Amino acid sequence: MADSHGNAKGATAHTEAGGGHKAPFPPFQKDTFASQLVSLTIAFVALYLISSRLALPRVRKTIDDRQNKIEGDIAQAQTLKNESDAALKAYEVELAAARTRAQAIGNETREKLNAEADTERKALEKRLSAKLADAEKTIASTRTAAMSNVRGIASDAATAIVQQLTGAMPDRKLVDSAVEASMKG
């Protein structure tokens, strides 16, 4: 029957020497040590030459290409940043100029509208002053007419009162002078 390692019963492992004595680990055997060092040196030199002549230049080229691409992208980004900064400065200058022009236009328009409003106000004041003067003249003439009518009415009323009280008709000049004296105060 086979054991758990697949060996036939009674067979020994390849590292065991006959009689139960173990042989040293093969790479450390004195007989093969020098040839193993030479083989190892040849393998490392061959691996170094292959990698330094074939693989490493490709890796270096890939790294250099990647570095150049990154540097190019950074340079392009810096150029675009400089252009955008210049555009921003130009925009700010134009914006400031536009604000100044808008302020000037606003001031000019305000002054123009104020001048027009002053002109209209003065014309309106002049018309109102003329109407007021006309109204005052009308009031004065109406007052004068009313006062002259009041004198006549007062004279007529005084004459009628004196006639009622005394039964005789008073002198018209005397009544007019009495009314005039009482109106003057």
UniProtKB/Swiss-Prot annotation:
Give Gene Ontology CC terms. plasma membrane; proton-transporting ATP synthase complex
- The ranges of region (Disordered) come to 1-24
Which positions form S-S bridges?
none
Cell location: Cell inner membrane
**Family membership:** Belongs to the ATPase B chain family.
Instruction: Write out the function statement from the record.
Output: F(1)F(0) ATP synthase produces ATP from ADP in the presence of a proton or sodium gradient. F-type ATPases consist of two structural domains, F(1) containing the extramembraneous catalytic core and F(0) containing the membrane proton channel, linked together by a central stalk and a peripheral stalk. During catalysis, ATP synthesis in the catalytic domain of F(1) is coupled via a rotary mechanism of the central stalk subunits to proton translocation. Component of the F(0) channel, it forms part of the peripheral stalk, linking F(1) to F(0). The b'-subunit is a diverged and duplicated form of b found in plants and photosynthetic bacteria.
Which protein are we looking at?
ATP synthase subunit b 2
Q: Where does this protein come from, organism-wise? A: Nitrobacter hamburgensis (strain DSM 10229 / NCIMB 13809 / X14)
